[in-house]
A protein has these predicted regions:
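Nucleotidyltransferase catalytic core that binds NTPs
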Residues: 8, 13-220
Length: 220
C-alpha cells in the first residue's frame, strides 16, 4: 500500500490510502453526495466497472455540491465513512476524501484536474446519472470536463437521456444498466419516520446510520 498522496498546484487536495501504487489504466470516477450510499449506487458501480472494462473505480463523496441544498446533507466525514464501509470488502473499489478536504464548493472540473495530475497516464471515466446530463451545461467549465474525462451516463427512472440537447453528444458514453429505483432521499425519510431500510443499504451502513443517529431530527 502507499500512504495518502498530497499534491499542490492551483488546487489543493489529498487522497486516502490507495490499494495499489500503480496507476490504473482505466479509472472510473463516481462522485456524489452519497447521503447515504445505497444498494443502487453499488449496482451501478459494478455495471460500469464491467461494461467499461475499468481497472479501478474511485468513489468521491462531495463536501459541498454546488447543485444541491446543503441543509439536509450529513457531515462529509459521515458520508465518507459510510462509503468506506459499503465497499471495504471489494478490491475493485476505493474511496477518496479529495473533495472533503478541499475548501469551497465541490466542482467536477477541479476534481478531474486533480486526478489528472495524479494519474496522468490513466484514462478517466466520470460517471453521472441521466438527470445530471440534462443540466451539465450549467456546470463550471463543462468543455474542460469533457477534455479531462469520458462522461459515462447511466439511466435514471423516468429520465430519457437520449433527448438531452447537449453539444458534447459524441463525447458521451451511454451505458445501459438496471434502473434501480432507490433514492437517498427516500432512505432519509424512512429513517426519520422510524421505518426499516434493510436491503436498501448495506448492513454496515444501516448500522452506522443507527449508531450515529443520522437522519433523525437533530442528527448530523
Amino acid at each position: 500500500m502507499t500512504q495518502g498522496l498530497t499534491r499542490r498546484n492551483q488546487y489543493t487536495y489529498t487522497l486516502t490510502i490507495l490499494i495499489t501504487p500503480m496507476n490504473p489504466g482505466r479509472l472510473g470516477i463516481y462522485g456524489g453526495t452519497f447521503n447515504p450510499i445505497h444498494t443502487g449506487h453499488l449496482i451501478i458501480a459494478q455495471e460500469i466497472y464491467e461494461q467499461c472494462k475499468l481497472d479501478r473505480l474511485l468513489f468521491i463523496p462531495s463536501a459541498r455540491p454546488p447543485h444541491k441544498h446543503h441543509a439536509n446533507i450529513s457531515a462529509p466525514e459521515h458520508r465518507y465513512q459510510m462509503v468506506e464501509l459499503a465497499i471495504r470488502d471489494d478490491a475493485r473499489f476505493e474511496v477518496s476524501d479529495l473533495e472533503i478536504h478541499r475548501p469551497g464548493l465541490s466542482y467536477t472540473v477541479e476534481t478531474l484536474t486533480a486526478l489528472h495530475h495524479l494519474y496522468g497516464s490513466s484514462s478517466l471515466f466520470f460517471i453521472i446519472g441521466a438527470d445530471s446530463l440534462l443540466e451539465i451545461d450549467t456546470w463550471r467549465e463543462p468543455d474542460q470536463v469533457f477534455e479531462l474525462a469520458t462522461i459515462v451516463v447511466v439511466p435514471r427512472p423516468g429520465v430519457d437521456a437520449y433527448k438531452a440537447n447537449v453539444r458534447w453528444r459524441d463525447q458521451i458514453l451511454m451505458v445501459p444498466s438496471p434502473e434501480v429505483d432507490i433514492s437517498s432521499t427516500d432512505i432519509r425519510k424512512r429513517v426519520e419516520a422510524g421505518q426499516q431500510i434493510q436491503y436498501l443499504v448495506p448492513h454496515q451502513v444501516e448500522a452506522y446510520i443507527r449508531e450515529n443517529g443520522l437522519y433523525k431530527s437533530g442528527g448530523n
